[in-house]
Design a protein with these regions (language model features):
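N-terminal low-complexity, Pro/Thr/Ser-rich intrinsically disordered segments
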Residues: 38-49, 54-105
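Gram-negative bacterial Sec-dependent N-terminal signal peptides
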Residues: 2-20
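Secreted/extracellular small peptides and ectodomain modules produced from precursors
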Residues: 18, 41-43, 69, 126, ...
Length: 456
């Protein structure tokens, strides 16, 4: 990917600050012997769950109805250059409210939920591979490595609890309006069927990142615009929008030659772009991990919402499975429907034999132990305690997890997307996950806010 750090005299700020600037999905990748540099998470405005189409993962793959999540598009404004004074401030975790350990129901070995503490330990050790060298995390991660060494990487729930209380303080996340409850959704890693050769059986390509796709990282110009970027291509000396879905999915695509795998089902390709990563089962039995590489910069538009607005589906049946069923019964209308979403995601093949996809932290995410958050409000890599309910249920789900991923629709202090793992069962849970919940964040006692105030 080409990255430009020069100042364009006319950057459309309204575009850069739109709700969906990246792909509508979670970009996850697989683990290498040496951990890769963390990449930006997918932007998935459908990702009501971790990023679903019409309604994020809620559409993801379940028959469970979802409430459509709208990507808010900016109102037309005059073009202007944002100066550092005008630019929005980066959050400094000021919405985190200190609480006592005993105030958090379920985060104690005596609560009947103690086993969950030790089960979260492998995910925490993954976080430490990325955080351990950072000053504010170094002491806690060093102690974690020592505890793992002493217990053969299997500390008891009591040992984990004692460790957490010794090295961490706990904070309740809140929203801007002061409320402490928010939406908890889910995402997963799908399984597709494909081939390295195009054929009548496998006609739909996955594309590598195009050579002419340019990304402008706005924080190189304005630190206040961290996580903001624009994408496009050069025509002469002018940066113009990159090709949209309708322009790419034609008989002679402008990015021809970047195909690397072909899939048997166009619907599966579309939803793979929403999830951001997946497993492709090849004809010879080989399984290939594919992960998010980049996105064309076009705004994500939920096709589920389009179907609801047209009266083709109701909110009650606009789940991911409901959308798939509609698509298979209306193949003559499918291409036009998909083109309503101009966003397009490019992939890359990941190393074989890896334990799972990589999240935005740059470490492998683990099923039911990793969660996507908004890094403006929750430090990436931190342990978080999630209190919500099981998908489509009132059964409590209280679990220590790790904030190891992000998502374009995961915005706000009390907002999370739970990674359920890979395959059909995980997809069913992810698609049904649209629950209310609360979140607590565990931060090292040395952790310092942007305001230079030590959290105690």
């Amino acid at each position: 990917m080409k990255k430009i750090s020069i100042l364009f005299s006319a950057i459309l700020v309204s575009a850069t600050l739109s709700g969906c600037e990246m792909a509508n999905l979670r970009k996850t990748e697989v683990v290498k012997p040496e951990l890769p540099v963390a990449t930006d998470a997918k932007c998935d405005c459908s990702h009501v769950t971790g990023a679903t189409d019409a309604i994020k993962l809620t559409e993801k793959n379940t028959d469970t109805p979802l409430v459509p999540v709208q990507c808010i598009e900016p109102k037309p404004t005059e073009t202007k250059i944002i100066t550092p004074k005008e630019a929005p401030k980066i959050a400094d975790y000021g919405l985190l409210k200190p609480v006592r350990w005993e105030d958090v129901d379920g985060l104690d070995v005596d609560s009947g939920n103690g086993a969950q503490l030790s089960l979260a330990w492998p995910a925490w050790m993954q976080s430490c591979t990325a955080l351990g060298a950072r000053p504010m995390w170094q002491k806690a991660c060093s102690a974690a490595n020592q505890l793992s060494s002493e217990t053969n990487s299997k500390p008891s729930a009591e040992a984990v609890q004692a460790y957490l209380k010794q090295y961490f303080s706990i904070y309740k996340t809140t929203n801007v309006d002061g409320s402490d409850s928010g939406l908890i959704t889910g995402y997963y890693e799908p399984l597709l069927k494909g081939s390295r050769t195009k054929s009548a059986k496998y006609p739909y390509p996955l594309y590598l990142q195009p050579n002419d796709l340019i990304t402008v990282e706005l924080d190189s110009l304005f630190p206040e615009l961290k996580y903001k970027r624009v994408r496009g291509r050069l025509v002469g000396n002018k940066l113009v929008p990159y090709y949209n879905r309708a322009e790419i999915e034609v008989d002679s695509p402008p990015i021809k030659g970047r195909e690397f795998i072909y899939i048997d089902d166009i619907i599966d390709v579309f939803f793979l772009q929403i999830q951001g990563s997946g497993l492709v089962q090849l004809e010879n039995g080989e399984q290939v991990h594919v992960g998010y590489a980049d996105q064309n910069g076009q705004t994500y538009n939920s096709i589920g919402r389009v179907l609801i607005e047209r009266g083709e589906l109701t909110v009650a049946n606009a789940s991911m499975q409901g959308i798939k069923n509609w698509a298979r019964n209306n193949m003559n209308k499918l291409r036009e429907l998909l083109n309503n979403n101009p966003s397009y995601v490019f992939f890359r093949e990941l190393p074989a034999g890896l334990p799972g996809p990589l999240g935005a932290l740059g470490v492998p995410i683990l099923g039911e132990r990793s969660v996507a958050v908004d890094p403006k409000f929750v430090p990436l890599g931190a342990p978080v305690f999630l209190s919500t309910t099981e998908p489509n249920s009132n059964k409590p789900l209280k679990r220590l997890m790790m904030a190891q991923d992000t998502g374009g629709a995961i915005k706000g202090g009390v907002r999370a997307d739970l990674f359920w793992g890979a395959g059909f069962e995980a997809g069913a849970k992810a698609g049904a996950m649209k629950q209310a919940g609360k979140i607590w964040v565990l931060l090292p006692k040395e952790f310092v806010m942007n305001s230079n105030q030590v959290l105690r």
